[in-house]
Structure formats: structure tokens, C-alpha cells
Amino acid sequence: MKSEEKSTNKEKQTLIIRKYHQYLKLEKALSPNTVDAYQTDLQKLLHFLEGEGIAILDTTLDDLQHFASGLHDIGIHPRSQARILSGIKSFFHFLVMADYLEGDPSELLEGPKIGFKLPEVLTVEEIDRIISAIDLGTNEGQRNRAILETLYSCGLRVSELCNLKISDLYFDEGFIKVEGKGSKQRLVPISSRAIKEIRNWFVDRNGGWKIKKDFEDYVFLARWGKNISRIMVFHLIKELAKKAGITKNISPHTFRHSFACLLYTSPSPRDMRRSR
């Protein structure tokens, strides 16, 4: 009898998790990467509850506080703790909203106290050094220069850069069309320097790059003919920063932060000038 009840609870939990996944994806319109992160963090709680013999719908505030204490005890960074607990609060909010629970046991759950950390940014001189570290003698050299100029002058998220299409480019008007989070579209100004580097890249792209079917409209391609990936851009920037002697811990998002900072001194991305 107990095993049948346990099996029923497991099936119900699986159904709830599936509906929560749909809620994050369709109603909240979160990106696939964000949905995966929420699900991964939720699995940590589910594993804990299973070990304690607690059904998800029987969870109390005490249970959640016990779980939160465990995150601290095993040395998880406070920022990661805060992210995990934020995702869990989102899950219990969904359970109440979907009428699985009458009250939210996570409502009074508190995360760790963390200070505000300013994001790492690059100076104009450091950006010049990184871009100058690109070897234009390689097949990917001009593409890489166009990638970094576009990231910097447009302040794009790396996913937006990877999915940029030729049909999204409006060079005569000085804009590109970008599809951001939640499939929301926006027009973004692009610098004349970035336009020049993309056009130079198109000369190489059209002069011998093999392009896979259905990927002809993507601006930035990998060697195997499909659009570049987020991991590729991450490794590219890490490699160039090391080559340029930049010791800051940077990523593609660092270019977005640097773009935002430069906007304080330049009224428009098209007014941004560098010495190179």
C-alpha cells in the first residue's frame, strides 16, 4: 500500500514539474538556458526532500530553512545560494498560483546577505588591445574582429550576437534588428566601424566558407557552416584577452557592461571613437 502511495506521489510530482517547466517556458517566456538553470536548482531541493521522505506538497518553511542551511554548510557561494533560493520561491509561487497549495511555505524564506558587486568593465585601451590581438592572417580572423566590434558597439547579449541574421542588418539606416529575451525585438544602433568589419567579413564569408543549408542567413558562422555558439564566443574572448595581457576576469558579457559604461560619455554608440 505504501509503495503504491509512493508511486502515486512520484507521478504527481513528475506532472507538477512538467507543468512548471511549461509555465517558465511559455508564460514567463524565459530563455532555454534560464529554464534549465531553474530546473537544475529545483532538482537540488527535490533530492533533499526525497532524502528526508517529504512530499513536495507537504513541504514546510522549516524544511526549506533546513535545505537552505545545508547549502551554506557545504560551502556554496552566497550568490549561488541566493539564486537557488530565488528559483525555489518561484516554484512555490507557481504551486499556489496553480492551486496545488493554498499557502506559500517559501514566503518567509530568507536568502544569505550579499553585497553588491560592480561588474568588471574594460577600458577603451583594453578593448583596443584585445581586438588588435586578433590574427587577421587566419581564416577566422576577420570574422573574429567583426564579432568583437559588433559585441562592443551594439552592447549585445552573446545569444543575440550568435542568432543575428543578415536580414536583420539595416546598415544604410545605421541599425540592426535584435531578438532578445522572450522573443522581444528591438532596433539597436551600430557603429560605422562595426559595419565596416562586418562587410569585410562578408567578403571572406562569401569567398570560400561552406555554409550549411538553413544557415545562409546567419551573420557569424563557425568553420563547419552553422552559426557560432555562445561557448565559441566565450573561448574566443578568453583566448584574446590572455594574448593581449588582460588579467581581468572577462566574458562576452563584459563587453556589454563596457558598452553601458561608455554610453555615459558618448551620447550615441555611433559617436564612440577609439584610437586604433
Indicate where each model-derived feature is located.
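Conserved catalytic core of the tyrosine transesterase superfamily
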Residues: 1-266, 273
